[in-house]
Amino acid sequence: MNNMKSADNYQQLDNNALEQVVGGKYYGNGVHCTKSGCSVNWGEAFSAGVHRLANGGNGFW
């Protein structure tokens, strides 16, 4: 992957710093929610649905 940055460029956060991070929750099926609402990546959601049907309803993949 050419767009990945080296791990040397990142700083590890301690628990106090991690508590200050503001973000949302990703559900793994194309749905991402924050405090202001949820959004859907429809391409990923469709793909997750197809995979779920192919697996007999077992999980997202």
UniProtKB/Swiss-Prot annotation:
| Residues that make up the propeptide removed upon maturation | 1-24
* A GO term from the CC aspect: extracellular region
Give the lineage: Bacteria, Bacillati, Bacillota, Bacilli, Lactobacillales
Where in or outside the cell?
Secreted
- Described function: Active against L.monocytogenes and several lactic acid bacteria.
Supply the InterPro entries for this chain: Bacteriocin_IIa, Bacteriocin_IIa_CS, Bacteriocin_IIa_dom_sf, Competence_ComC
Record-linked PROSITE patterns = BACTERIOCIN_IIA
Q: Tell me, which GO biological process terms does this entry list?
A: defense response to bacterium; killing of cells of another organism
Query: Where does the UniProt entry say this protein principally localizes?
Result: secreted
Lineage top rank: taxon: Bacteria
Q: Which residue pairs form cystines in this protein? A: C33-C38
Q: Provide this UniProt record's keywords sorted from A to Z.
A: Antibiotic, Antimicrobial, Bacteriocin, Disulfide bond, Plasmid, Secreted
List GO molecular-function terms, semicolon-separated.
pheromone activity
Report whether Disulfide bond shows up as a keyword of the record. Answer: yes
**What is the name of the protein in this document?**
Bacteriocin leucocin-B
Family named by the database record: Belongs to the bacteriocin class IIA/YGNGV family.
